[in-house]
């Protein structure tokens, strides 16, 4: 076992090694960010072109000509709406990004009314969610007398029908489409919605409603996984739109870059523990030992960054962590024996592995840093409470006089 005297110069040398390693991590994180962001735009375009864009289905609108109105028409809302939506989540991966793609089966039955005491030619318009999406098994059936052929113009189907006074005609619409990120049903800012019900079924358990949309009035969990959600509006004024965000996925690129950017903080804690416990136990390491330890820690993020797009992200993370732990702890065991390994192994596992793994969960990295810092402070305060710090930093002349180099 090799022992070295702890001096102020050796601490400066360790600090220089730390700074150089931190610069390396920043370069690695920047390269990962550039690698991810440089292709994200083109990959997003490819996904939208091959799979489909975000889908926003609008509530149908209807009107009849009314010369008495300033606009020349009077709007009517469906007197009854029964909408069924089935969402199937199928994320797709391209490069270092997962894209939250899904399939939707849409089916709706509406009743289009004529609220006047005379027969009216009512025009019904149904807008498709996006002009860039494809719609399989599409049906649009408007029953009634004098129905013209539907006209498709700029993503909106318009059809006219003659409705007897104080009567309704049924409208049926259904299709199968594919979309990205979230699905939404827009009520077109209707001031009043009556006899409306939307039933949504998902095959995923993590549900999140986009900002500005309403929560369901009823929900029940499906035994096979997923939810049955219902929005029931018997008579609502100012009803909000209805939407569903697809579950979040772990994107390897952003996670790998964040781990690299925050790795210097982990190394700072790790080096602090080794320096202080070295002063307590008398097992002080040479700055060159710290150089190899920094390289072993750097190997974790380096391996993770360049294998994360080749294998599942969790498997890649734990394999990279295992390699780094083996390098660092194996080296310390060879240098300082079991006494040093018993200190370094839990420290590296806590600061490097657990802290890095917290980036897999939103909002936990800051809490992990705070808890780790407080626990580290408590352990170091207890370990050094009875230590005579005046004997730790030895003057250079005394070192040379004693012959301990």
Q: Across the structure, where does each feature detected by a protein language model lie?
A:
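N-terminal positive-inside, membrane-proximal cytosolic segments immediately preceding the first
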Residues: 1-9
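Extracellular/secretory-pathway and virion-surface proteins
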Residues: 58-61
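Soluble non-transmembrane domains of integral membrane proteins
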Residues: 42, 49, 63, 71-236
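Generic detector of multi-pass transmembrane helix bundles and their immediately adjacent loops
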Residues: 267-405
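Alpha-helical transmembrane signal-anchor/signal-peptide segments
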Residues: 28-54
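Cytosolic-side membrane-insertion boundary helix
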Residues: 238-267, 285-287
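Juxtamembrane loop-transmembrane helix junctions in multi-pass integral membrane proteins
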Residues: 7, 248-258, 311, 335, ...
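Hydrophobic membrane-insertion alpha-helices, especially the h-region
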Residues: 10-28
